[in-house]
Amino acid sequence: MVGGGPGAFIGAVHNRAATLDGLAVLVAGAFSSDPAKSREQGEAYGLASNRVYSTFEEMAIGEAALPPGERIDFVSIVTPNHLHFPSAKAFIERGFHVICDKPLTTTLEDAEELCRLVKKHDVVFALTHTYAGYPMVKQARALVAAGALGTVRKIVVEYSQGWLATPLEQTGQKQAGWRTDPARAGAGAIGDFGTHAEHLAKYVTGLEMERLFADVSTMVPGRRIDDDANMLVHYQGGAKGILFCSQISVGEENRLSIRVYGTSASLEWHQEDPNFLYVRHPDGPTEVYKPGHAHLVPAAQRGTRMPAGHPEGLLESFANIYSSAMRVIRARIAGETPDPLDLDFPTVRDGASGVHFIQTALRSGRDGTWVDASYDPPGR
């Protein structure tokens, strides 16, 4: 693991997700830019002292020098955004598989270079767009693909939080500090979780953006980065979309939801109540899909661990991304063909699309105009 030192929220989440299904064990890390903190975190995880590194560069070199049976099989990158690119590059160039937090990078140039490096070195690269791991999101994706909604006409995705409704970064709070720092975050609400909204819309509907118009704001006085954005989107095939993301919605915790309206039916899913997927018809009762039932598509069944009526949540969704990627990595190491179901995870090309979306939305917000949002990342 690179990142995830003392006091970091996301590092522990990544570790629990990676180990939930017994497919991986943490054996090495460069957990902090402060060597003392990296050692402290390594001790907390019970790692051998010679596998705890001071920098990601030292770790990439050190692990590559070990025999194949001893070195890491893949690396989790859970640093602030500005370190995703150099960390991933260092490991990819040495042939290591990578699972990286989002957004992929802070610039499109870096994102595209990672796409080319992944293809050149033929490594597995997974991006943790966590919400794509929920079983009911996979069910929604399958329903849209099967034509259960008819032709998609409208997509509405909301992602609202309220934790930055005040200048929390001025109090010394660690997460608020780096997430509102343009040098480390790259972008604010759009980069932090607007990319989740963009990816969720694309993942569920299969539709790519063509044009967008963004109203991007900084609501908290003195803040150096956007904290609220509202976007109108034109998708391929004529569908229209509304995406909005906000960090200043007082009282909201993690309100991510998606509604998709087709010519014959619609669906709705809420991340804060993730075990229910609603499908509505104009002339019949509402259908409610729930995990743990045999009528669900294989991808939704694969992502469910408990019997019906036993709620699962964010950690399990996170683990679904990890476990799929890890099974593909294991198949690659064994020289086997992976199960097609395991290929259902966000990739480096999804990451590049997310970075392109961020920059396109910010440009539209700055210029006050509709902009071309179509994009085909390299590395196909």
Predicted segments with their positions:
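Beta-loop-alpha module in the N-terminal Rossmann-like domain of NAD(P)-dependent dehydrogenases
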Residues: 51-117
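Predominantly a Rossmann-like dinucleotide-binding segment in NAD(P)-dependent oxidoreductases
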Residues: 124, 131-223, 277, 368
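Glycine-rich, aromatic-lined ligand/substrate-binding cores of catalytic
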Residues: 193-275
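C-terminal glycine/acidic-rich active-site capping loop/insertion
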Residues: 230, 235, 264-345, 380
